[in-house]
Amino acid sequence: MRVLHVCSELFPLLKTGGLADVIGALPAAQLAEGADVRIILPAFPDLRRGIPETVLVREIDTFAGRVALRYGHYRGIGIYLIDAPALYDRAGSPYHDASLYAYSDNYQRFALLGWMACELACGLDGYWRPEVVHAHDWHAGLTCAYLAARGRPARSVFTVHNLAYQGLFSAHHLSELQLPAEFFQIYGLEFYGQISYLKAGLFFADHVTTVSPTYAKEITQPAFGYGMEGLLQALAHQGRLTGILNGVDSDIWDPQSDTLLPTRYDAENLQAKAINKTHLQTAMGLQLTESKPIFAVVSRLTAQKGLDLVLEALPELLALGGQLVVLGSGDTTLQEAFLAAAAEHSGQVGVQIGYHEAFSHRIIAGSDVILVPSRFEPCGLTQLYGLKYGTLPLVRHTGGLADTVVDCALENLADGSASGFVFNECEAQALVKAIRRAFVLWSRPKHWRHVQRHAMRLDFGWQLAAVDYLSLYRRL
């Protein structure tokens, strides 16, 4: 089966979020299952540098001018790069400028991504033509609209990684993008008077997936649907909405082989994890002690991630004898609040603003608990990394967090299924109660190690998701 993934990021060459991790792992897992998989992306500078050897497939005229399609390989996967320097040859983020303003021509930049994916489905590359086109998030949403406009030359799947980002643009761009005028309606890509690239993917795809079963249910409700819940309810009723859990790339995230760690370890050698803890405490200026559990945040610092709750719960966490480590960037108010906490609680709170992939590995390996108190979380990868590294996740019961972490309630401890700590209400007091339960388990080292070992043996590998996606493709 020939499958084309359409997206805007690829780990490790270009990453702004979890989407890149998915595209860096899922196609390879599908290839291992026997599929013929390729990826199409805009030729952003980081991607051009990472895939320097490419050949010209075709040059064609598009609504955005003359565009070249190039082809190369990265880690055994075929990669198409859309070579349009005027649109894509910009340093930094693929979405916004240095002042964090979204590029004014994003409507054109990401429409071209969908256009070129559709052209491949129509035979642009004489040597390879996809049977299934799999588009990811709003950046690739128009792919499904262009395929519909061209008579559906391939089956299409659209995956929502985060419904909050909807790709909204002015309606007057419709004719410029060469989309049929009749597509601009409620039963189409119109959303409150604008074009929504996300809605285009949802409406015109043959099948829609999300990145966890629970999130697939949540987004049919007004609280999580961002105005799309009616359409999503209809898709669910038609059997065209499925939740498939993301996985962990064990080539990158595995404490047994992770070269970014001071010391590698596994479930049978947890003493070595303590060495990582000492290194982390030193790096973050924390008091050197094995007796205090380290709670960690590795996240975008936003309200969605529930990090205001962490700030509210921090006095109790410290009073109970814990330490806190934070790595991330985002909302200025949250950044300043965490930095102030680090200054006030020197030796017990360490904060690093920004994101460093290598350091994130060392934090997850060196911590005892990873905090993911999200208000909503389509899947979440951080808690999966925590499980893999024996760093018990403390999460809110939402989205993929609900699907992957089993609370350390007495009955779950008794049957051996417990893997972390789960709270329900999106309130600081609920988080505090979960933190207290973490300290209760921490006070029983034998039980803590038992839960750690169980968590580390859980299988959230990409092969499971790869098989589920391939099975879905065959049903289309």
UniProtKB/Swiss-Prot annotation:
Q: What class of enzyme is it?
A: transferase
Q: Which chain regions cross the lipid bilayer?
A: none
Pfam families, A to Z: Glyco_transf_5 (PF08323), Glycos_transf_1 (PF00534)
The pathway is: Glycan biosynthesis; glycogen biosynthesis
Please provide one cellular component term from the Gene Ontology annotations of this protein. Answer: cytosol
This protein's record includes keyword Transferase:
yes
Alphabetic keyword roster: Glycogen biosynthesis, Glycosyltransferase, Transferase
Q: Does the keyword GTP-binding apply?
A: no
Q: Which residues bind ADP-alpha-D-glucose?
A: K15
Q: Which GO terms describe its molecular function?
A: alpha-1,4-glucan glucosyltransferase (ADP-glucose donor) activity; alpha-1,4-glucan glucosyltransferase (UDP-glucose donor) activity
| Catalytic reaction equation(s) | [(1->4)-alpha-D-glucosyl](n) + ADP-alpha-D-glucose = [(1->4)-alpha-D-glucosyl](n+1) + ADP + H(+)
Q: Name one GO biological process term.
A: glycogen biosynthetic process
Documented EC number(s) = 2.4.1.21
Recorded hits in PANTHER family, A to Z, give: ALPHA AMYLASE DOMAIN-CONTAINING PROTEIN, GRANULE-BOUND STARCH SYNTHASE 1, CHLOROPLASTIC/AMYLOPLASTIC
Family note: Belongs to the glycosyltransferase 1 family. Bacterial/plant glycogen synthase subfamily.
What function does this protein fulfil? Synthesizes alpha-1,4-glucan chains using ADP-glucose.
This protein's name: Glycogen synthase
Organism encoding this protein: Yersinia pseudotuberculosis serotype O:1b (strain IP 31758)
